[in-house]
Structures are given as structure tokens and as C-alpha cells.
Amino acid sequence: MLSDIWDGSFVLLAWTLLLWVLGFLFIFASLVGMPPALLVAVFAIAPAVTGMMIMVSDSARGKFMRLGSALRGMRRFYWRSVALTLPLALLLWLILISAGVVSKNPGHSELTIALALQVGVGLTMAILHIYALPLLALLDTSVKQTALLAVLLAGKFIWQTLALLLVCIALLALATLYLLVWLIVPGVWCVIVVNATWRMARQVAPGLAGIDKS
């Protein structure tokens, strides 16, 4: 895994610079309001992250990482990556609206319960998204297949899922403390999660992974 990061360091860094540009666009959009920021996240950042994961998926199969693969994959998987991330973005927006309603109406337990349920569903969807884009990049599955496989992996590999979640949180915390760490966080995360997802997918869906177990 470390060799994947080292061998592909140039292309990972180059694609990370694109993600930086989109990240600044997200920040500027958030100054306007949450809806524009979420639109940037869904229609720009998610496809770009998928493109990086497609590069890394080539490496997981023993091929070289190439920027061309990311560009072609980003176009090919664009609408599927949007379809996978849009529900989570809409739910996040709903949670923020509900949180505002609860803060303005204290003492209404039914509103608090509804918000708690929304947060629970949102956290569950966020955990499933650990696998969603990597599965899409690795297996070229439909949106429905990708979602079902994400549920299957999260349910079958509970401890590995928790470990990936902790790694994600740790990388985000580190990047928050040191801004320049953002230069390596996207690449490191993609290498870790794509390789982990590839190993799991080969066990639960060998046919989709191109493995003949007959």
C-alpha cells in the first residue's frame, strides 16, 4: 500500500491540486449558502474524487496510475457518482434545516426525536459512502448494485468498516491541524479505502471483481 502511494505520488498530487481548486470553490459557495455548497460537493467534488479512485483502482490491479484514467473515468462515472452522493447531500441539508427548527422551538420533544432520527440515518448513509465511490471505481457497477454492495460490505466487515471510519476521522483531524497535510490526505485516503474495498469485494462479489472461483 505504501508503495502504491510512493509510485503514484506525482499523479495523486496533481489530482489533489484539482481537488484543492474545487475545495476553494466549495468554501466560496458556502459563503453564499449551504445549497450552493452542497451542489459543488455533489456535482464537482464527488466526481473528481471518483476520478482519483479510478486511478488508484488501476494500481490495486497491478497497473500504473495515470491521469488519463482519472479524466476518462470522471466523465464515464460522472452521473453515477452524482446519483450516489446526492441523497446524502439532501439529507444533510434537511438535518441543518431541522436543527434550525429545533433551536427555535425548544421543549418540543417530537422535533428533537425527528432530528435525532435524521442524524442517525445520515450517519448510516455516511458510513455506507465509505464504500460507495470505491466500489463504483473498482467494479463499474450500477447505482443500485453499488448501494447494495456497500450495505453488504458494511454489514459483513464491521470491524474493517470501523477501522476505515477511524482512519478517515484521523486524517481529517490531522489535516485540520496542519493545512499542508491536505496535499496528501486525498491520495492517502483513496489508496487506503480502495485497496481495502478491493480485498473485501473480491470475497463477497468475486464475479464482479473478475475472479473465477469455480
Label for each model-derived stretch:
Residues 1-104, 110-113, 128-214:
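Helix-coil boundary and N-terminal low-complexity module in membrane systems
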